[in-house]
Structures are given as structure tokens and as C-alpha cells.
């Protein structure tokens, strides 16, 4: 990240829903690095009760994330919220309204579906309750949060060079099948959610986009491969020399093009500070393409490009490009009711 971007979000108010770990934590810290006040929400808290804590065995908390945000140069505010409970979200938004009277950035990153995803099983053989819970956690929560937060995003007059923004965090920048029916529904749904919200917000000056990381080097991934952020590269290179070792903890070759959670965080900052970001509303973007457009890097100074790697290793796949979006707009509702929203 260039020095010019430091404090570029000073006095901005952000809400990162699902900031405990992974992409959410990386985004929250990057927003703090840019000087923002960041509400860091989630269920995993030092104050968690046994019934409402997040996935057992995971050590990260929202308080820790908030501390990291403040250390990066912003102001981190931890708030324990279950985003599937409307009353919880309404209470949070009421607090932000009372304290700041507006919201500039909303990041919907609530997920928690790793333990619910049953790979290599067709939909009629998976645990239905797990699949429905995944939809509740990772789609319903996003809708609930956007519903209550939208009036605060709209409360700030849209100036010519400044737009409040909603970012939906997903997996993948295309409409290919993602290997599990419920996982697929979640990741495609939030892309569509960003688009649908953009149609209702665009004339009001609020931007709505979806954003995907590449191979995310999250805390859980580092733990799985028994490495740290400091050792992952050397260990990955060594393990990749072993072919078909059978060790499930051996890092795949894909791991060498992975990105830290701060990479997607810097993508969020780039979008939030772009005066022309309204031109992007309604679409899905990737960290690797935005890094080249906005000239930001990962923590190690690199610009990992998952798209190029995937095409080289697995073959070409079609992303959501201009041709793809030409089928989305204008739609029949736009043609019949041109003043709709």
C-alpha cells in the first residue's frame, strides 16, 4: 500500500460484519490502517456465552480484531452481534446512528459455513439442517444487516466525489458451480444481492459491489497446514517438492499463490476511496484484478494473481465481464418502468 493511502479514510465510519477472523479481520485492519473508525462485529467474543459463541476451537475474538484496528491507525470498536437476529442488528445500527449519525462503509462478510459444508456429497445426501443453517448464516445475515444499515448509508448526502459503499464478500468472480449446492447458493446469492441492491441504491448515490479473494491464507488455513504467516512460503515450497505424499497437511501448489487477509482489505480501501467507484456498482470484483488497477500489494510486496494461476493450471474459465452483465441490464422492469427506484 502506498504512503498516499495512509489515513485516506480518516473520519469515515465503517461496519465490518463478521470481523472476527479471515477476510473480515483483514478488511477491518486495512480500514484502520487507512484511518477509519471500524465497528468490528461477530459472535466470538471474550464475553461470549457457551450458547452464542462462534465455532468451538477457534481462538480469535472481535476484541482482538478491534485492538489490531486501533494499532494500525484507526479506531476499532468491538460489538458482539449475531447478524442472523434482526433485533441484534437493529440495536447495533441504532448505536452507530446515535454516535455518528451516518455510515460510510458496510462490509458484509458473515460466513461461518466451513464446518457446515459437506464436500463430495450430492444435495440429497448432505445434512439438510447444515445446508439451511449455512443459508441463514451467510445469506439471511447479509440481507438483515443491509436492511437495517441502508438508512444510515443514505443519511449522508452523496457528494459528487464521495459515495457510501456496501461490499458483499464472496468466493469467485464467475457463475460456475462451486462444488456443493448450498455453498454455491450462498456465494452466488451474495453476488446477486450486491447487484439487486445496486439497482435500488444507484440513484441515491450509494454503491453496492461484491468482492472475492483468491486462495485466502486465513488463520484456519495456516493452522491446517501447520504454518504461520512468517513460515508459510518456505514450508509450502518444501512440501510441494513431495508429490502424492498422502499427507493431508501437505500444502498444495495452489498455496504458493495464496494471499493474506490484508490483501482483500486493501482492495476494500481502494474501492472505498475511489471517486469514480459508482461506475463499478452492481458488479463482482477480484482482489487480483483490483490490485493491478489500483496498484496495491499484499503484506510481502507481491500481487498474487489467482486468476492467471487458475487459468494456467486448470484451464480458462469465464468471469462476469461486460458481455455477461449486458444480459442483466437493462431488464424488463427497467424498460417498462424506467423511473423504478
What is each PLM-predicted segment?
Residues 146-147, 195:
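A short, exposed helix-loop element centered on a Lys and neighboring polar residues
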Amino acid at each position: 500500500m502506498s504512503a498516499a493511502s495512509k489515513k485516506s479514510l480518516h473520519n469515515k465510519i465503517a461496519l465490518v460484519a463478521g470481523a472476527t477472523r479471515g477476510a473480515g479481520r483483514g478488511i477491518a485492519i486495512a480500514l484502520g490502517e487507512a484511518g477509519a473508525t471500524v465497528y468490528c462485529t461477530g459472535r466470538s467474543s471474550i464475553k461470549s456465552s457457551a450458547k452464542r459463541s462462534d465455532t468451538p476451537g477457534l481462538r480469535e475474538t472481535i476484541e482482538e480484531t478491534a485492538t489490531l484496528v486501533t494499532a494500525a491507525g484507526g479506531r476499532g470498536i468491538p460489538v458482539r452481534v449475531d447478524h442472523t437476529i434482526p433485533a441484534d442488528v437493529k440495536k447495533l445500527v441504532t448505536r452507530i446512528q446515535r454516535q455518528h449519525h451516518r455510515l460510510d462503509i458496510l462490509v458484509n462478510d458473515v460466513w461461518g459455513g466451513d464446518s457446515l459444508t459437506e464436500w463430495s456429497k450430492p444435495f440429497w445426501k448432505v445434512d439438510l439442517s447444515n445446508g439451511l443453517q449455512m443459508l441463514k448464516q451467510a445469506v439471511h445475515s447479509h440481507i438483515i444487516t443491509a436492511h437495517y444499515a441502508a438508512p444510515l448509508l443514505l443519511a449522508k448526502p452523496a457528494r459528487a466525489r464521495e459515495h457510501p459503499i456496501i461490499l458483499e464478500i464472496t468466493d469467485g468472480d464467475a457463475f460456475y458451480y462451486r462444488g456443493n449446492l448450498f455453498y454455491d447458493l450462498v456465494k452466488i446469492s451474495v453476488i446477486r444481492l450486491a447487484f439487486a441492491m445496486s439497482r435500488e441504491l444507484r440513484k441515491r448515490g450509494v454503491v453496492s459491489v461484491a468482492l472475492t479473494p483468491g486462495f485466502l491464507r486465513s488463520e484456519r488455513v495456516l493452522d491446517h497446514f501447520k504454518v504461520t504467516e512468517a513460515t508459510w512460503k518456505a514450508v509450502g515450497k518444501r512440501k510441494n517438492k513431495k508429490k502424492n505424499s498422502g499427507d493431508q497437511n501437505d500444502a498444495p501448489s495452489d498455496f504458493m499463490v495464496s494471499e493474506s487477509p490484508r490483501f482483500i482489505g486493501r482492495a476494500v480501501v481502494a474501492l472505498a476511496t475511489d471517486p469514480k467507484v459508482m461506475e463499478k456498482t452492481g458488479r463482482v470484483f477480484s482482489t487480483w484484478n483490483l490490485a493491478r488497477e489500483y496498484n496495491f500489494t499484499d503484506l510481502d510486496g507481491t500481487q498474487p494473481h489467482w486468476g492467471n494461476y487458475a487459468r494456467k493450471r486448470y484451464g480458462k474459465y469465464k468471469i462476469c465481464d461486460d458481455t455477461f452483465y449486458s444480459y442483466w441490464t437493462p431488464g424488463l422492469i427497467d424498460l417498462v418502468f424506467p423511473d423504478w427506484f
